[in-house]
């Protein structure tokens, strides 16, 4: 029995080697076609092979071939063909119900980074990639994928979209460094404190207390226009500092007095008090309002920020909640 099992294993290994060798030969032919400029023919052959492999349940071979093909087309400036094969990479992951792994997330982020930032395919790709990476949990996507997307968007100086993805990652330090660059290159000197205040409040609304603390500490230490603190010259920064301490303590009276004392600073952005209402519920036991007083844009923003995090009150999670609309 043992000998038979060993022989079967050896045969399987030989078949696997032959299959991989076959894939490599096919890849070589396809690469030669692309190098010659026969883009259309090569693209159609990639698609044909994809569906053939998928019908034979060779999901890994299909995915790896589409990934290498996408990179090849990107290197030759063939955006449409590359984007199409990138979608097929996702299709293989979805249909085979492949488990999330760091290497796969990095491959998806690599493809994303090579796509034309203005292409509609990129929007579709990132939406599907995040959905797959959530593993059917109903979350907003894997924090690691969000981090990788945020880093790419930061390099492209797409700060608003980068901030969105950082908020759903676990990378508070990266978020802070991006916000420092965002503030110094695009913001007004008078708004230095507002960049980090919004991020901290939104992290807290997503029950990510750890990243909220890291983003505040890193930002205030590294921003060239912020003097050493605490305490800080800017009242809003002092409020955020006290708020983070209060969240750790969990005392409602401290939170209430803090919000009352700093109302002049909090009135600088109408969303601050909306965020603080939610933070009061999450960390200080404040009961939800019976009837929502939020309407229009503010109501939509708050609803989209809270999302599924309302269903879970006990644990911190960087991926809780629904998408945050960023201005």
UniProtKB/Swiss-Prot annotation:
Assembly information from the UniProt record: Component of the BAG6/BAT3 complex, at least composed of BAG6, UBL4A and GET4/TRC35. Interacts with BAG6; the interaction is direct and localizes BAG6 to the cytosol. Interacts with GET3.
Outcome recorded upon mutating residue 84 to K: Reduces tail-anchored protein delivery
Impact noted for substituting residue 258 to A: No effect on interaction with BAG6
Gene Ontology molecular functions: protein carrier chaperone; protein-folding chaperone binding
Region (Interacts with BAG6): 195-271
Effect after changing residue 188 to A: No effect on interaction with BAG6
UniProt keyword Transport, yes or no: yes
InterPro entries: GET4, TPR-like_helical_dom_sf
Protein purpose: As part of a cytosolic protein quality control complex, the BAG6/BAT3 complex, maintains misfolded and hydrophobic patches-containing proteins in a soluble state and participates in their proper delivery to the endoplasmic reticulum or alternatively can promote their sorting to the proteasome where they undergo degradation. The BAG6/BAT3 complex is involved in the post-translational delivery of tail-anchored/type II transmembrane proteins to the endoplasmic reticulum membrane.
Phenotypic consequence of residue 278 to E: No effect on interaction with GET3. No effect on tail-anchored protein delivery
Mutagenesis or variant effect for residue 259 to A: No effect on interaction with BAG6
Statement: the UniProt record of this protein carries the keyword Nucleus: no
Organism listed in the record: Homo sapiens (Human)
Stated consequence of mutating residue 195 to A: No effect on interaction with BAG6
Name this polypeptide is given: Golgi to ER traffic protein 4 homolog
Substitution effect: residue 122 to H: In CDG2Y; uncertain significance
PANTHER family: GOLGI TO ER TRAFFIC PROTEIN 4 HOMOLOG
GO cellular component, one term: cytoplasm
Subcellular location: Cytoplasm, Cytosol
Result of altering residue 242 to A: No effect on interaction with BAG6
